Amino acid sequence: MLLLLLLGSLTIVFYIWQRRTLSFWERHGVKYIRPFPVVGCTREFLTAKVPFFEQIQKFHEAPGFENEPFVGVYMTHRPALVIRDLELIKTVMIKKFQYFNNRVLQTDPHNDALGYKNLFFARSPGWRELRTKISPVFTSGKIKQMYPLMVKIGKNLQDSAERLGSGTEVQVKDLCSRFTTDLIATIAFGVEANALQDAKSEFFYHNRAIFSLTLSRGIDFAIIFMIPALASLARVKLFSRETTKFIRSSVNYVLKERERTGEKRNDLIDILLALKREAAANPGKMSKEVDLDYLVAQAAVFQTAGFETSASTMTMTLYELAKNEALQDRLRQEIVDFFGDEDHISYERIQEMPYLSQVVNETLRKYPIVGYIERECSQPAEGERFTLEPFHNMELPHGMSIYMSTVAVHRDPQYWPDPEKYDPERFNSSNRDNLNMDAYMPFGVGPRNCIGMRLGLLQSKLGLVHILRNHRFHTCDKTIKKIEWAPTSPVMASKRDIILRVEKVSGKKDFGQK
């Protein structure tokens, strides 16, 4: 009897708490999506029907909210805001950035040093200092110094395509991922991963494992995305134990070798060694923060982001060009016009290719790899606080999560006519005056945008030039007609393999051959 009474009391308390919690937006007069008990508005994501970015996209595109500047939602029991209006997005991401300089995502600071200490997850005020110290490796000058190393990997990709043989049906993401694995290993760590040559490359195995989620890893990511306040209690980790061990041992080895030999490569390892020396020269707080895991964490996020984003961009580009072979032939003609039979793809010339830029820009419009942007509201204890004016007089609570769907904005016919059509001509210089570039944000917006944007674009372009100059990609019987997104992936990734048929092209005369 006592147990039943206790259970009844707990049920009543839970009901009252849920009702109070899930009435937040109604009480504040904000239009919202009606939540379900316990799961809030995220039932599709939590039941693995859609990936997280698509859940945010569905919020943005929910019927009845077409003219609303924002949408109130519930991430399980936590109120959150999905911003739809471009001016409000600019306000949050740029003009009033001081209120939104932290990301929502968090991992366990006590048990996940590689996740918690890296630049992507770093919180204010430490993130700004860390970004300032790491950013030199991503400047145009440093990238140009690393470019010869990148070209070597590009030639390896070209050779790998040659070895496939004409008429081979290839799993495109696998090929592109091996290219980006080798490239990142070379320019970031100064090691040869040999993923293009070795089917069992250890580097490639661990890179792929980061995005291959088991049930337990899926739960970790659900907490990181949805309920970051539970990250410490649930002891969630960004990287698995096996991957953490591999990255830590690899980076530690390279750091020691570089210190022993004194070699300079103008790469990420040089930057990390400079941080280590600075910490040693300034004992105190900095020396406590800059330990081995702090250094390894920066290399880990560099490796992860560089591997997946560029590989996905290349994959989706080849998929679209295989479906639109006239566009593919036009790009190949530009490659021939710029380089002919030259062995070397020069840094300056690849930057000057207008149609290549149009193609990559259009891929990133239709497929912005992360798919959404998130920030956490940080209200000051004193002074002016952030409100939703002029749309609403509500003052956002400290710690509230804010989301923006880049996919929804990039596919909004208000900004992009016929948005489902793959059309590189949108980005033709003659059409520039017709574009609203505020509606284009594949690398994020504001001071916390993607630090590796230049490098990511360059490695995608370099890979495409090397693989398309002598090869044509066709659809085949195994090519999927419509992409369904993998519900457990933290980024935009096809649920099924994208398979294309590759043919050797020996020159201009072959361009029309099918």
UniProtKB/Swiss-Prot annotation:
Keyword set, alphabetical order: Endoplasmic reticulum, Heme, Iron, Membrane, Metal-binding, Microsome, Monooxygenase, Oxidoreductase
Entry-linked CDD domains: CYP6-like
Membrane topology of this protein: Peripheral membrane protein
GO MF annotation list: heme binding; iron ion binding; monooxygenase activity; oxidoreductase activity, acting on paired donors, with incorporation or reduction of molecular oxygen
Localization per Swiss-Prot or TrEMBL: Endoplasmic reticulum membrane; Microsome membrane
Predominant location category: endoplasmic reticulum
Cross-referenced PROSITE patterns: CYTOCHROME_P450
Gene3D superfamilies: Cytochrome P450
Binding residues for heme: C450
Alphabetical GO biological process terms: insecticide catabolic process; response to DDT
Cofactor(s), by name: heme
This protein's GO CC annotations: endoplasmic reticulum membrane
The protein's Enzyme Commission number: 1.14.-.-
SUPFAM superfamilies reported for this sequence: Cytochrome P450
InterPro entries: Cyt_P450, Cyt_P450_CS, Cyt_P450_E_grp-I, Cyt_P450_sf, Insect_CytP450_Detox
Function of the molecule: May be involved in the metabolism of insect hormones and in the breakdown of synthetic insecticides.
Classification via PANTHER family: CYTOCHROME P450, CYTOCHROME P450 6G1-RELATED
Family according to the record: Belongs to the cytochrome P450 family.
Protein name: Probable cytochrome P450 6w1
Organism, scientific name: Drosophila melanogaster
Gene: Cyp6w1
